[in-house]
């Protein structure tokens, strides 16, 4: 993959991200769950946009998991436990410009299985 192709893919993802963020917003009762994936790991955080605060976060580096579907399911289980400890049962899912496919879809499905309403 050439450098220009990579820059174009990243800029298109950022463009999709901005369009998504224009329409969704989280609150303390129903936070926005944002996911970020790199080649090595996955990160997730619950964000209260009205107060600009991160309510809770979970990372794949702390759990020593890879950025694949199995790792996404493990991360979602850990993240759901943190959300339940913070008394959050409902949230808005922000796919952060990524396609709702693969790791992102596996993370969202695992959150739903662990009792978080998206």
Swiss-Prot record:
Intrachain S-S bonds: none
One CC-aspect GO term: cytosolic large ribosomal subunit
Entries under InterPro entries matching the protein: Ribosomal_uL18_bac-type, Ribosomal_uL18_bac/euk
GO biological process: translation
Pfam families listed in its UniProt record: Ribosomal_L18p
Keyword Chloroplast tagged: no
UniProt KW keywords: Ribonucleoprotein, Ribosomal protein, RNA-binding, rRNA-binding
Molecular functions (GO terms): 5S rRNA binding; structural constituent of ribosome
Subunit-level organization: Part of the 50S ribosomal subunit; part of the 5S rRNA/L5/L18/L25 subcomplex. Contacts the 5S and 23S rRNAs.
Family annotation (NCBIfam families): L18_bact (TIGR00060)
Entry's family note: Belongs to the universal ribosomal protein uL18 family.
Annotated function: This is one of the proteins that bind and probably mediate the attachment of the 5S RNA into the large ribosomal subunit, where it forms part of the central protuberance.
Annotated PANTHER family: 39S RIBOSOMAL PROTEIN L18, MITOCHONDRIAL, LARGE RIBOSOMAL SUBUNIT PROTEIN UL18M
Protein name as it appears in the record: Large ribosomal subunit protein uL18
UniProt organism field: Campylobacter hominis (strain ATCC BAA-381 / DSM 21671 / CCUG 45161 / LMG 19568 / NCTC 13146 / CH001A)
Underlying gene: rplR
